[in-house]
Each structure stands twice: as structure tokens, then as C-alpha cells.
């Protein structure tokens, strides 16, 4: 389990680093409003990744509960972005998907041989 927790921590850290870098780039290239929309989505994605990790941790238990709360998080973010005039929908959505960058990073790190992995 220690290896799983280390992986979970790494994924959260990489997601957070990507969030900070992309937030700065969006703020520089667009506006603070767009960057704030991105940041809201990215924080939602970070929370989603954490919830997903907790769900994976519970695999094998007898409880059969589907990811309703994770889906609800995504729906609330999108509805909030669509209804609130200060938020932009696309940056919120793309911000939410930022956690995928950490998953891609991990996959590439696992597949591409390096001096550490050899």
C-alpha cells in the first residue's frame, strides 16, 4: 500500500504543478477572469483525482457505490460555469481536465525506459 500512496501523492503533486504553471500562462496570455475560471476547474479536477484515489483504495470492499459524488462534482462545476456570468465554461472544463496531464506523465514515465527504470 505504501507504493500506492506514493503514486497517489506524486499524481497530486504533478497535477498541482501543472495547475500553477498553466494558471500563470493563462493569466499572462488572456486575463485574470479566464485564469480564475481555469483555476476553479483545475481545483475541481484536483478534488476529483483525490476522490478517485479514495475510491480505488476501497476496491474490494463489499459496498457497491458508483461514482455519483465524482460525477456530481463535475456537473456542479459545469453548471456553475454556465450560470455564473463571471466564469467562462471552456477554461473551467479544460481546468478540470488538468489532472489528466498527471496521468499521462505517469504513463509515459512507466512506458519509456530511463536510467532509473532500467
UniProtKB/Swiss-Prot annotation:
It is a multi-pass membrane protein. InterPro entries: CGL160/ATPI_dom. GO terms for cellular component: plasma membrane; proton-transporting ATP synthase complex. Keywords: Cell membrane, CF(0), Hydrogen ion transport, Ion transport, Membrane, Transmembrane, Transmembrane helix, Transport. The keyword Nuclease does not apply. GO terms for biological process: proton transmembrane transport. It comes from the Bacteria. The chain crosses the membrane at residues 11-31, 73-93, 94-114. The keyword NAD does not apply. It is found in: Cell membrane. Belongs to the bacterial AtpI family. A possible function for this protein is to guide the assembly of the membrane sector of the ATPase enzyme complex. This is ATP synthase protein I. It comes from Synechococcus sp. (strain ATCC 27144 / PCC 6301 / SAUG 1402/1). The gene is atpI.
Amino acid at each position: 500500500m505504501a507504493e500506492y500512496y506514493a503514486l497517489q501523492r506524486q499524481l497530486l503533486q504533478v497535477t498541482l504543478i501543472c495547475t500553477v504553471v498553466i494558471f500563470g500562462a493563462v493569466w499572462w496570455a488572456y486575463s485574470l477572469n479566464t485564469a480564475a475560471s481555469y483555476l476553479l476547474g483545475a481545483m475541481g479536477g484536483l478534488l476529483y483525482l483525490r476522490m478517485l484515489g479514495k475510491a480505488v483504495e476501497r476496491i474490494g470492499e463489499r459496498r457497491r457505490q458508483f461514482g455519483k459524488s465524482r460525477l456530481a462534482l463535475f456537473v456542479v462545476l459545469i453548471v456553475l460555469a454556465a450560470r455564473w456570468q463571471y466564469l467562462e465554461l471552456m477554461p473551467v472544463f479544460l481546468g478540470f481536465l488538468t489532472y489528466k496531464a498527471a496521468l499521462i506523465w505517469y504513463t509515459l514515465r512507466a512506458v519509456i525506459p530511463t536510467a532509473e527504470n532500467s
